[in-house]
């Protein structure tokens, strides 16, 4: 299943699990899961709410990293190049395994793991998981973000290109949010006021 720009779907998997698929993301899964394991593949970003089944583990294959769960809520995101994978756990417990099926770490609620495929290195940080996965509810948050990061987020959400004059104090960080249902013009006005810059839409 491929989710086109501007849409987030909620396909019901064969076992009754739900998945919120972010725009421009792709999810692959069989019509029926095998009796011993439930395995899906993700490119992009998705949030999973997995139906518990201790005898049939649920595995998400994310290009070099697999996420193994029994029943839980979490998100998985792969970078465009496929060399970085992020996992955020909301409820339950998940284990992260590399391409050699070696367990790297177990995550607990409100933890985020960033895995770097090339050198098989990972970091784990404490986060506000509900806030970071709020995109599935149509809310886009950013915390301690640079102006460049905010611009990329707006461009990705609205599928537009923006230009702006870089401010003198380029080290500033910002926190804020916007709704995906808001008009782009409104979001640009709010962002300009917050950052003190002037974002211009490239036609």
Annotate the PLM regions.
Residues 1-203:
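A residue-level detector for the "anchor" residue at the start of short, highly conserved motifs
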């Amino acid at each position: 299943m491929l989710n086109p720009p501007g849409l987030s779907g909620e396909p019901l998997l064969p076992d009754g699990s739900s998945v919120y698929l972010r725009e421009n993301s792709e999810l692959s899964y069989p019509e029926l899961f095998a009796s011993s394991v439930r395995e899906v593949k993700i490119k992009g970003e998705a949030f999973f709410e997995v139906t518990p089944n201790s005898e049939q583990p649920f595995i998400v294959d994310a290009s070099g990293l697999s996420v193994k769960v029994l029943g839980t809520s979490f998100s998985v995101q792969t970078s465009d190049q496929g060399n970085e994978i992020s996992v955020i756990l909301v409820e339950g417990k998940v284990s992260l395994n590399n391409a050699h099926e070696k367990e790297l770490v177990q995550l607990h609620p409100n933890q985020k793991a960033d895995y770097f495929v090339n050198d098989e290195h990972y970091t784990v940080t404490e986060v506000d998981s509900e806030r970071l996965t709020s995109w599935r509810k149509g809310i886009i948050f950013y915390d301690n973000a640079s102006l460049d990061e905010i611009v990329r987020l707006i461009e990705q959400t609205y599928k537009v290109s923006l230009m702006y004059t870089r401010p003198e104090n380029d080290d500033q960080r910002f926190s804020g949010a916007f709704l995906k249902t808001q008009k782009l013009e409104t979001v640009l006005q709010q962002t300009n006021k917050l950052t003190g810059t002037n974002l211009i839409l490239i036609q």
